[in-house]
């Protein structure tokens, strides 16, 4: 269904999921497009970013950000154009980075909007390699991982928007990079396009043995996006004074209980202690928001020089957002997942 000029479609949280989200956890609503008041702008969503963190916002467990309440619009970063403006700093047709969520239109007072120029070459990249995922990769690896030339860097979810960027930055810093991904096609992309030294399929029956063979000198940096059995295979290979930037644990986002089997916490704690391993979680905007301009300048330069490659998976139509999101959580995506809402994209 095409975007309309006078009606606003929006996906709201219909109910909180128990386990993996299902279609009945979402509800598509529609009403008239609102009119901006004094000091406000009306934004039309062109691109919507879908990211794993949104699963946490669907639950009401305590976290670093408040949950989406039932009946409210699903959250999400967006690239938008100004339709109408009563704000002195914005004019119609301008492109902006915004936070409209899963809907066609939104009203903003201008706070938090980032101008993208009149005719950005790749506007959706502001939701990926030049946005939150790229920033997450950059700061997590460089500030927490602190890569050194000749070290072995292992990256989980190696072809996702964060993992792919981590691995490429690691190569720029002189690391030997081993990726972990799901399936032969993704692994080929990691080595042939992204320049990883190796990439292993975590679906393989002998994955732990393959990882040990791929890292004969151990692991100096493990960029954690996944958790679960991948982390179990990594743990015994970690070197003394290794570093683990903890970005995400997507394998457990839909979990409703602790995994079966023995308690692994004592082994983890003992390994961290004996090997003096640094394991640090981070929330990108809260912890590193003040360094966004540093990232934008450096990443922009690398892209211009052809040193960073980026892949998107674009789905057309706001109506397809829930299905694309559920596929993302199931690992069916190949690249940054973006919903394209408008024909001018």
Task: Give residue ranges: language-model regions.
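Glycine-rich phosphate-binding loop and adjacent beta-alpha segment
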Residues: 229-308, 342-345
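Short glycine-centered segments of the SAM/dcSAM-binding site in methyltransferase folds
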Residues: 95, 152, 176, 242-243, ...
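C-terminal hydrophobic helical "lid"/dimerization subdomain
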Residues: 2-6, 286-345
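Short glycine/proline-centered loop/turn elements that form peptide/ligand docking sites
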Residues: 85-89, 179-189, 203, 207, ...
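Mid-domain Rossmann-like dinucleotide-binding core that forms the NAD(H)/NADP(H) cofactor-binding site
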Residues: 127-205
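Short amphipathic alpha-helix with an adjacent loop that forms part of the alpha/beta core around
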Residues: 206-216
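NAD(P)H dinucleotide-binding glycine-rich loop of Rossmann-like/cofactor-binding domains
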Residues: 74-81, 89-157
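Glycine-rich beta-strand-centered segment in the early N-terminal region that forms part
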Residues: 32-50, 58-102
